[in-house]
Amino acid sequence: MAGPIEQFAIKPIVELGEIGGQPVAFTNSALFMVLTVLGAAAFMFLSSRRGTVVPGRWQSSAEILYEFVSKTLRENAGEKGMAFFPLVFSLFLFILFANLIGMFPYAFTVTSHIIVTFALAMLVFLTVTIYGLVRHGFRFFRLFMPAGVPVVLAPIIVPIEIMSYISRPVSHSVRLFAVMLAGHITLKVFAGFVIGLGSLGTLGMLTAVLPLAMTVALTALELLMAVIQAYVFTMLTCMYLNDALHPSH
């Protein structure tokens, strides 16, 4: 049985040549990112192609997700934040589908790679920074001096706030990456226990009951975490967008 880390290996599927002496290939990671986008697009197409007053299952599911993200965005960024709804909803769907697809046997979890989650976090960071500077100009830098803080504390507070702001893409991306990585490793380890004990005969199969129960419980927990982490990433995105809209708050 393969080790618990091997499931995260990026493997080439189609070699595409070289650029600057470096090999270029269509990998399993790229394949599952494409499948994630296609899955999310298919879900939205099926749920919206026949809009009815009394929604069916597909339409109800899409409306629940729409209202959930819409409410989260309004609560954290205000009514003006709805201008960013397409971005926020797309991020939520991508992460949710990527996490759920990764739960299938032999599937690849793209959100277990820091390069993917960091790219998503940088997209949010650059959107917030560029929009904030374009909309507010130098007033955007009020973000680094919270309202009500005495001026005498500025030499201490401002550097701390700047470092906190710059480190956002790291904390934003590591949270999702670490949770998905740790969850899948744990599942793999317990599944390995079940297979290993089961191969020992009758006594081993009886002993494997506890690891099997743990594996089932961890699978349910990992499904829950797949949804929660999509929500957490989305909520933090909404909070950061609020800084671009209201830097003086």
From Swiss-Prot:
Keyword RNA-binding: no
Main location: membrane
Membrane topology per record: Multi-pass membrane protein
Disulphide bridges, residue numbers: none
Location(s), subcellular: Cell inner membrane
TM stretches of this protein: 26-46, 84-104, 114-134, 143-163, 177-199, 216-236
One cellular-component annotation, GO: plasma membrane
GO terms assigned for molecular function: proton-transporting ATP synthase activity, rotational mechanism
Keyword Ribonucleoprotein part of the UniProt annotation: no
Keyword terms: ATP synthesis, Cell inner membrane, Cell membrane, CF(0), Hydrogen ion transport, Ion transport, Membrane, Transmembrane, Transmembrane helix, Transport
Similarity annotation: Belongs to the ATPase A chain family.
Role: Key component of the proton channel; it plays a direct role in the translocation of protons across the membrane.
Assembly description: F-type ATPases have 2 components, CF(1) - the catalytic core - and CF(0) - the membrane proton channel. CF(1) has five subunits: alpha(3), beta(3), gamma(1), delta(1), epsilon(1). CF(0) has three main subunits: a(1), b(2) and c(9-12). The alpha and beta chains form an alternating ring which encloses part of the gamma chain. CF(1) is attached to CF(0) by a central stalk formed by the gamma and epsilon chains, while a peripheral stalk is formed by the delta and b chains.
PANTHER family reported for this sequence: ATP SYNTHASE SUBUNIT A
Protein name per its UniProtKB record: ATP synthase subunit a 2
Organism in which the protein naturally occurs: Brucella anthropi (strain ATCC 49188 / DSM 6882 / CCUG 24695 / JCM 21032 / LMG 3331 / NBRC 15819 / NCTC 12168 / Alc 37)
Classification of source organism: Bacteria, Pseudomonadati, Pseudomonadota, Alphaproteobacteria, Hyphomicrobiales
